[in-house]
From Swiss-Prot:
Classification of source organism: Eukaryota, Viridiplantae, Streptophyta, Embryophyta, Tracheophyta
Localization per record: Endoplasmic reticulum lumen
Family stated for the protein in its record: Belongs to the protein disulfide isomerase family.
Domain Thioredoxin: 24-143, 339-484
Residue span of motif Prevents secretion from ER: 495-498
Residue(s) at site: Lowers pKa of C-terminal Cys of first active site: 129
Molecular function in Gene Ontology: protein disulfide isomerase activity
Residues forming the catalytic site: 61, 64, 406, 409
GO cellular component: endoplasmic reticulum lumen
Protein's UniProt name: Protein disulfide-isomerase
Signal peptide bounds: 1-23
Provenance organism: Ricinus communis (Castor bean)
Biological function: Participates in the folding of proteins containing disulfide bonds, may be involved in glycosylation, prolyl hydroxylation and triglyceride transfer.
Enzyme Commission number(s): 5.3.4.1
Principal location class: endoplasmic reticulum
Length: 498
């Protein structure tokens, strides 16, 4: 009996602890400065706020766990701001909230969105991830998109020598030009700082003759400032985006250059990248000639980057480049085409870029060396043999695109070996593989987004992606269903005619 009573009291004790824990968790939730949103209250809550920040998170996400105390602390700071700023969160991993995650294009965790005007305007959060930084960034974001500059002292405060700052000069703060400028400032405020003034004399390098309307963009590189007088919204936005980039983006170990490198690779223009040893003998001459080329082709749909070999190893691996080709220049277009000039001299740069612009340069293709021996059951394909083995062989080819580090590819390898052995006596069938990390793939034919990806190309040119189970029998069934037996039929028809 005593043992039974002891068990009862133990259960009561455990249940009491659980109740206390639940109560503490509920109390913590109640005291939180961060609003908890879900599919039932999201739209209604957002519609009531002119400015609100929403974190889309997943409970299992390590980065989300790290952000949580900082986000909570920032919310506590911001709720006592002159104009309170509201921070909220949504568990995007919850089934009921996944539609919200899709609606707001959430592709990773945590993702923070700034919602203005009751959710009508949506911007990415691009600020720090620690409490004080979050608070300061959002204080600026919740204020006016552009600050009025009333004195030289104010201008010096806002316009530093190490950042980009855009100022609109106007004869009055009204009219179409002013409204369009403010519209662009509001749209781009997450990326740039904006100001406006009635007197250009307040500005660095300001001239008393400038009365506006004019937009002046200050930057810590190239010509230091540039003016623009077209107040069409699209034209003004394009001016800000293009003028805030260096004529030549520098890719090295300096962190201050990294934002420009990111913008460079996000640009829709063709990208010319010159990689060299920054300490090499001809470095200064190459840099000078490259700058000249950048100015020569500015605004012609091509942007330029100058990369130090030591900082560019990732790019070398991606493009299949070798250090003995340095100095080199490679151009990549939006459709994936690449053009390479290796071991260039300073005087080679301008003529080669001109030839590229005129369509006179042959495309470059990243390829592993052609194997000297290729007698295994599964044939090795590289970019330089893709045409011969897959497209022009007149055979039915099953081709696996793999990555050497991919676990699923390693599991598939012995299965493909078995399939290949099964077709050893069938001359019309080829089982092959291509390392997609070391060879360029024609994206207009094969859509490779993960590994392994398997395609089948029939002898007559029909291409089908395999999405069945990765078993020997299923793969063979797929091949038999899609193979082209026209050659065999023609042979049979020829015998009948005889």
């Amino acid at each position: 009996m005593a043992s039974f009573r002891g068990s009862i009291w133990y259960c009561i004790f455990v249940l009491s602890l659980i109740a206390v824990a639940i109560s503490a968790a509920e109390s913590e939730e109640e005291q939180s400065s961060v609003l908890t949103l879900d599919s039932t209250n999201f739209t209604d809550t957002i519609s009531k706020h002119d400015f609100i920040v929403v974190e889309f998170y997943a409970p299992w996400c390590g980065h989300c766990k790290k952000l949580r105390p900082e986000y909570e602390k920032a919310a506590s700071i911001l709720k006592s701001h002159d104009i309170p700023v509201v921070l909220a969160k949504v568990d995007a991993n919850e089934e009921a909230n996944k539609e919200l995650a899709t609606q707001y294009d959430i592709k990773g965790f945590p993702t923070l969105k700034i919602l203005r005007n009751g959710g009508k305007s949506i911007q990415e959060y691009k600020g720090p991830r620690e409490a004080d930084g979050i608070a300061e960034y959002l204080k600026k974001q919740s204020g006016p998109a552009s600050v009025e500059i009333k004195s030289t002292e104010a201008a010096n405060t806002f316009i530093g020598d190490k950042k980009i700052f855009i100022v609109g000069v106007f004869p009055k703060f009204s009219g179409e030009e002013y409204e369009n400028y403010m519209s662009v400032a509001d749209k781009l405020r997450s990326d740039y700082e904006f100001g406006h003034t009635l007197d250009a004399k307040h500005l660095p390098q300001g001239e008393s003759s400038v009365t506006g309307p004019v937009v002046r963009l200050f930057k810590p590189f190239d010509e230091l400032f540039v003016d623009f007088k077209d107040f069409n919204v699209d034209a003004l936005e394009k001016f800000v985006e293009e003028s805030s980039m260096p004529v030549v983006t520098v890719f090295n170990s300096d962190p201050s250059n990294h934002p420009f490198v990111i913008k460079f690779f996000n640009s829709p223009d063709a990208k010319a990248m010159l990689f060299m040893n920054f300490n090499g003998e001809a470095a200064d001459s190459i840099k000078s000639k490259y700058q000249e080329v950048a100015h020569q082709f500015k605004g012609e749909g091509i942007i330029l980057l100058l990369g130090d070999v030591e900082a560019s190893q990732g790019a070398f691996q991606y493009f299949g480049l070798k250090e003995d080709q340095v100095p080199l220049i490679i151009i990549q277009t939006n459709d994936g085409q690449k053009y390479l000039k290796a071991n260039l001299e300073p005087d080679h740069i301008a003529p080669w870029v001109k030839a590229y612009k005129e369509g006179k340069v042959q495309a470059y293709r990243k390829s592993e060396p052609i194997p000297e021996v290729n007698n295994e059951p599964v044939k090795v394909v590289v970019a330089d043999t893709l045409q011969d083995i897959v497209f022009n062989s007149g055979k039915n080819v099953l081709l696996e695109f793999y990555a050497p580090w991919c676990g699923h590819c390693k599991q598939l390898a012995p299965i493909l070996d078995e399939v290949a052995v099964s077709y050893k006596s069938d001359a019309d069938i080829v089982i092959a593989k291509l390392d997609a990390t070391a060879n360029d793939i024609p994206s207009d034919t094969f859509d490779v987004r993960g590994y392994p990806t398997v395609y089948f190309r029939s002898a007559s040119g029909k291409v089908e992606q395999y999405d069945g189970d990765r078993t020997k029998d299923d793969i063979i069934s797929f091949i038999e269903k899609n193979r082209d037996k026209a050659a065999q039929q023609e042979s049979a028809n020829g015998k009948d005619e005889l």
